[in-house]
Design a protein with these regions (language model features):
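Elongated, amphipathic alpha-helical interaction scaffolds
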Residues: 1-241
Length: 241
């Protein structure tokens, strides 16, 4: 299939489970409120975001200080100076957990300059949306109601969580299998859109009635609503994916 045919066959709504679709929605600063709303449905209460003051995608982030090349989908800093790495991982990758920690530690390291004290460090959160399921020791513990895992420093015997430093959050979207009728909460409806946006022909009536973050998320996925520059970039990204 040539590039012209690909452009002709663009779906009317982006697929949020693809890297290109995810980036089209969440790397757009006009959708900052959507990113905040989605993250606040996932993050622990102590990490709740009121606003984002810094916003950069992977094309702009060049300051991670290690020799190995790092590719970050989206990096945000809130008004409390907490850093959030947000990414879509479309396919399984070896040592993925290690990569997440590596990326987070690079940004954690950058928070201090020479002579600054460690109390000036702020938490770094990695939020990875996975379009596949991780391998778990006990698969029975993970299902459509339990598909988000939270990883941080914990004392083994007591279970006491250390002061927030680096946290890794995995969202295993393929474990979310609820039908529309089973989606009752805002959280459920949001992930139903994540799983099904690529198949929408128009914004469903139930989303129009629901409003809130679900409606904003669905509206942001509509390709016809993109401005000329964004649509062209999306088309190019789709041809190259």
């Amino acid at each position: 299939m040539d590039n012209f045919e690909k452009r002709q066959q663009l779906a009317p709504f982006v697929n949020l489970r693809s890297d290109v679709g995810f980036k089209a929605v969440f790397a757009d600063r006009n959708n900052k409120d959507i990113l905040i709303g989605v993250l606040n449905q996932i993050l622990p209460p102590e990490a709740r975001i009121e606003d984002i003051k810094e916003y950069s995608d992977r094309e702009q982030r060049r300051d991670v200080p290690y020799g190995k090349k790092t590719v970050l989908d989206l990096v945000c800093v809130d008004h409390d100076d907490n850093t959030f790495i947000v990414e879509m991982q479309a396919s399984e990758e070896d040592y993925f957990f290690e990569r997440c920690v590596y990326y987070a530690s690079g940004l954690y390291h950058l928070e201090l300059s020479d002579g600054e004290r460690y109390k000036g460090l702020h938490p770094v959160y990695v939020v990875s949306f996975l379009n596949y399921s991780l391998r778990h020791d006990d698969e029975s513990l993970w299902d459509t109601d339990h598909f988000i895992s939270y990883w941080h420093f914990t004392e083994k015997r007591t279970g006491i969580v250390a002061n927030q430093t680096i946290s890794v959050i995995f969202v295993e979207m393929t474990l979310f299998t609820k039908t529309l009728e089973e989606c009752v909460t805002e959280f459920d409806k949001m992930f139903y859109i994540f799983m099904n946006s690529g198949g929408f022909l128009k914004i469903p009536e139930w989303i129009e009635k629901t409003g809130g973050i679900s409606r904003r998320l669905a509206e942001a996925c509509e390709v016809a609503a993109f401005d000329k520059e964004k649509k062209l970039k999306y088309e190019i990204d789709k041809m190259n994916e």
